[in-house]
Amino acid sequence: SLEGNPATVEPKDVVLYGFGRIGRILARLIIGQSGLGRGLNLKAIVVRKSSDGDLEKRASLLRRDSIHGPFAGTISVDDANEAIIANGNFIKVIYASSPAEVDYTAYGINNALVIDNTGKWRDAEGLAQHLKCPGVARVVLTAPSKGEMKNVVYGVNHTDILDEDKIISAASCTTNAITPVLKVLDDKYKVINGHVETVHSFTND
């Protein structure tokens, strides 16, 4: 959670597996909460190396966003240690083509929450690859899941998460948009049935 009492929330290592737009927005949110006792520390991002100057390109994309504007703070690149420094936070950039290639404990990362924002795997079997990596405790998918995995919308059904749930989905953007509204209506009036339409950007879903 990005919320909590600074006196009671134990810091949790976070790894972003993938660094597309969703990953970069998540990075901004987590970095913005660092030092406030919110409990999440962004320790690393995992990506495939694209070309020379990869670190600077990724740092540049983190600095700028057409909707949210410029990054609030400073971002620099540490080429020698393959890292991005954002507001003083050292974020290791790990280059790998699959989860099996990564040992997070080698980077001082333990009991980590991996947030998979690649969309490559959307079922428990695929996402379970992360749990086999040393240093990983839990996995969150930033897309609607397939199969029996829980789709969780914070504020609606987050209390359904059990300690044994090692992999969960943060549900779809449409689900996150409409479910809180439907919950308010259902709590007050009861929803018998309904129809929802969404205008969506082009994706490969």
Predicted features and spans:
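N-terminal Rossmann-like NAD(P) cofactor-binding subdomain of oxidoreductases
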Residues: S1-T203
